[in-house]
């Protein structure tokens, strides 16, 4: 026998499917939603549907946007010669918060993971390598988290870009941050320093 009405049990189950949300947190959220004004609930549902309907990866870099090209790719004042490679759009936000980076980005949409069967073709890698062949791209900064999968992905990209057909400098952000940490949890100063102190690999 369930402790909750069927509709509430379904809500708790669906909320607990979200990353970092356990069943206990999902239960709290469910009770909060029940107590919310119906109009606010409708607005929440509309926002979720709107995001799923209108938000998509940028056709150029993979960052999330509601247009064909994201605002960063469309900004003519940004430095086209430098591309920083990150795992996801949350990492873009983290770097942008430093207020010190003026280049472009490339969002992979994940990391290589043999354990989870995530292979190169499952990530936004092909478009990265196409961008790196363009004459105006001079440097690729690898800003992936210092985790096992992050290192695996970084090393894969380095090996590909070592090929003579790619005339770009490749560098990696300094590792003055805890191993295993995700970039989104770095404070702005640490992240800025990590980019500033990046080391050249190729």
Swiss-Prot record:
Known role: May play a role in DNA repair. It seems to be involved in an RecBC-independent recombinational process of DNA repair. It may act with RecF and RecO.
UniProt KW Cell wall biogenesis/degradation keyword: no
Keyword hit for DNA damage: yes
Superkingdom assignment: Bacteria
GO MF assignments: DNA binding; zinc ion binding
CDD domains: TOPRIM_recR (cd01025)
Protein name: Recombination protein RecR
GO BP term (any one): DNA repair
Key words, A-Z: DNA damage, DNA recombination, DNA repair, Metal-binding, Zinc, Zinc-finger
Stretches annotated zinc finger (C4-type): 58-73
Family: Belongs to the RecR family.
Start and end residues of each Toprim domain: 81-178
InterPro entries, alphabetized: DNA_Rcmb_RecR, Rcmb_RecR, Rcmb_RecR_Znf, TOPRIM_dom, TOPRIM_RecR
Coiled coil ranges: none
């Amino acid at each position: 026998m369930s402790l909750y009405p069927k509709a509430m049990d379904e809500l708790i189950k669906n909320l607990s499917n979200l990353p970092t949300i356990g069943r206990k947190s999902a239960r709290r959220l469910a009770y909060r939603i029940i107590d919310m004004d119906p109009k606010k609930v409708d607005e929440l549902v509309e926002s979720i549907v709107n995001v799923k309907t209108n938000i998509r990866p940028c056709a150029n870099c993979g960052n999330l946007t509601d247009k064909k090209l994201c605002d960063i790719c469309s900004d003519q004042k940004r430095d086209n010669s430098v591309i920083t490679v990150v795992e996801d759009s949350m990492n873009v936000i983290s770097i942008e918060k430093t207020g010190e980076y003026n280049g472009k980005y490339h969002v992979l949409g994940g990391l290589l993971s043999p354990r989870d069967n995530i292979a190169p073709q499952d990530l936004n890698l092909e478009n990265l390598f196409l961008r790196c062949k363009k004459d105006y791209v001079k440097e690729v900064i690898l800003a992936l988290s210092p985790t096992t999968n992050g290192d695996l992905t970084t090393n894969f990209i380095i090996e590909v870009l070592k090929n003579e057909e790619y005339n770009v400098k490749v560098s990696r952000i300094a590792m003055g941050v805890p191993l295993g940490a995700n970039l989104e949890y770095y404070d702005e100063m640490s992240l800025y320093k990590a980019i500033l102190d990046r080391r050249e690999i190729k």
